[in-house]
């Protein structure tokens, strides 16, 4: 046995340095690791499988992650899991082989949604996590969400170090690697979510999963707490035949709308590909952007926890600062960088009760959650909010908010290699304009928020945001006005005009 372990050490020590590109269907592609450097994002990793990373590259990633875990001085034990795509299990096992070569004990929970892997860190008392998922990205993408300090996930510092270890083959192979499969782990997760009183209000809920991973779990959880569940595209099918399971995708939201209206449901709840995000359609079939649902939940939570602190990402509505009910409840909200790792970290740093992202990530600290994002915990929070308002519909609660006109997240293509330079140039443009007393959409600049890209707010409260996507070769553009739809469109026109001065910026995935 000692001899066999020693051989594995030598093999690991000789593991080749990853190449940034290799040609598929060649000897080199099957004999060397390939890892495109741009796949290391701000707080997780994403690649197109085959053209940007191969399985040997994933092995290198696992060895690098294991090396980093030892560097951080954390107990070298890690939860692994994978989402429902045709290739995710293979990617995970390549990752596992690298982790084991680096001396990590792997606790694999199999097919899972991302929050189930986060829960496993607590339930199994394991400090680290590696969830193989491309989240809401289209088929062809793969990636890994990682953490070594529950409930937090990696941020830029850890990702920068991991990138250096992997791309420069700074691996440190160790003894002690092992693999342990945890059978039937989803039952433990579902039991944890449902060990609570059943709802007294009988809610009819459309559960939409886009044929993604959440389809195996979301209907069961909602039924267990007393909902009448109408499943929509909950059969697992990794070809995603109807639409990509993405809660910001208008195709998914429109399918939810149609089913809510057809069945006269109280609410539609849609889950993304790895179950850490959730989108909402009200009983009248209107899609409610996640940031507006966040304001509704903040009202509900702050009524029970006066003076509650919340975190919202910079893409979110201005109502978190101006809503009279939140002010009356003594609630405070801090705008922070977009990204699940950033919001999670800030939530825990300032002791916020909950955090909200326009993309549909919702984070709950005690007494609601454990500090991580979980689409199912959010779904239960929506059901609880409806129960606490027995005479109100979801539409009633939405219509009680001050009126604003806002856009979805609009994403023009921009290559990973240049997107941050473009955003820096846009930021400088608005800073220079503010110094000169210039106008945007016909009004003077009242405020610039630069914590993540640039959010420019003018005198009447209308604002526009430009930031770089952390997950795709895209920018993210959002606009909102508390005045009128026309003012919202004027702001978009003004922001887009600045972007069009940069030829690197391509077509949008959707516009208003």
Protein language model regions, located:
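Phosphate-binding and adjacent anionic-ligand microenvironments
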Residues: 305-478, 483-512
